[in-house]
Amino acid sequence: MKNLLRLLLVLSIGTGLALAVIPRASIIPVPEDSLNNGGIGNLVAGYDIDGDGNIEIYMVNDNWADSPTEIVPRIYKLERPYGEEEFQVVWSANAQDFTPDIIQNTWPTLAVADLDGDGKMELIWGIVNWTNASSPNPYRIWVYEHEGGDSDNFGVQNPVTGKWEPNSVWTIADADNQNIRPISMKVADLNGDGKDQLILASRASGMRIIIASVDDIPDDGDFSETWTLDFSEKELPSYDADNKWDVAVIENSAYFFCEAKISKVSWNGSEYVYSSMDPLPGGITFDCAQAADINGDGNIEILAGEYLYGDATRNIWLLQESGDTLIRTPLFDLSVEEYLNGGRICGGAQGDIDNDGNIDFIFGSRFSGPPNAMMFRVEYQGSGDITDPANWELTIADTSSEEFAPGTSGFWNVIDVANMDDDPEDEILYTSSIPNAGVSFPIVILDSNDYTVGVRNVLTPLSFELGQAYPNPFNPTTVIPFTLEKAGTVTLSVFNIKGQNVATLISREYTEAGKHNVMFDAGNLASGVYFYQLKVDNTMRAGKMTLNK
């Protein structure tokens, strides 16, 4: 059996479905959660831009219910210093510190790139417009460039306020009160001029297809740069599609997805050429289309899943270029009761979570199950025809069930796959772009490498085991067992589902080798799911337990 499947936990639920669930290695609470109560709008992870050896996560907040706090756009850099247990905010910016009247709508975009090619990486943040009398043509693209060196900071620091402001901003539109809402963004060099462009799919009629470039991102934010709208559907004599919800790029062509048409925009060497084809039968794809060379033959394919606004199918589709069209192969129908059960596919990312050389494609969901919040993993098995579904594997990477997402709450489209530690396998990060009852869900990190996070020397075998708390469920006490093969410095902590520490049972204590049992008394805690995390030297493992009072 493949390496990944040896590491997966196999659980059973009431439907009889076997769930190959990848262990949750970390639960990261939302920064300033009382302010960021509208969900997480987007995140990117796995970078070490400042070169300090600590892996970084960049995230932006979201607005779901238009409350006074969630309409304020905020961006954060999180980092976990080596040897520490929790991620910390080391840099942040509030868009209203630069433009006081700006407020945001739902589902912003976020990317890391070097648009001007100066060697300094940039955070490219697409704040979704909310036009009003005070802000009729707001900045929709915000670029914060890294300060350089080992600095944590991005942007230009205002000498008066001390706040961090963008190096560059752009409205996209040249007129007021245009409703432009990019939801999917790729960075690529479509026209082959050696400089990256922004390729944006927008879900509103003000502009649906956006291809843009910038000549410079000024270090001092003096606004000397020039943004150019290279192409939009406004240039066409007529437009045969609808609002766009997704985009994928294959070499010099970009494919924009909606329920009316799949629109193709290609660079032919001298100009952009538009064509269109029939949509997927299940309607739109929701920011989940992923382009990759699946079988290493030099050809780029697309994997995408259906969300809504078509028929009731919810397929994972393999899409292959053929002239001006895409050849379509349905790989898995997730609409059945055991999977989505009428729910929707949304969000996606790719990487190699089992280090087997084959790409793992991760897809999120909305209204899935029961159980709720299914995260799907789709992988080509490395041999055979890629159009034969028998050569693919579908597993469930995680499902939040009732512990994170009661009923059908949450919108689990915010996903990234990145190497968050020093082992060779990538990890999955995911969360919801909408809250539950005004509380944002935390970021979850899934690690197929046997619960291990932050291992500095992957050649060193794990020297401890963390057992299942017993009894489980419990009220109000339970025992957490662990075994050390050799002595080490131990920390044992308990967290709630928001990622907040509710108890530290052992704190950096030198502990002898052998079997250990630690009593946990939850008499002062509310019923619910809790996670216990054992850190021995620089290696962590985690487990889950349920308190029923």
Stretches found by the model and what they are:
Residues 62-68, 128-134, 203-207, 261, ...:
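Short glycine/acidic-enriched loop and turn motifs that connect beta-strands
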Residues 51-61, 117-127, 192-201, 248-256, ...:
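Acidic/hydrophobic-patterned starts of short beta strands in beta-sheet-rich repeat architectures
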Residues 459-470, 474-549:
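C-terminal outer-membrane/trafficking sorting elements
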Residues 33-66, 71:
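Beta-strand-rich domains and repeat architectures in extracellular enzymes and scaffolds
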Residues 41-49, 106-115, 182-190, 233-235, ...:
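Beta-propeller blade termini
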Residues 20-38, 77-104, 145-179, 214-240, ...:
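Blade-edge motifs of beta-propeller repeat domains
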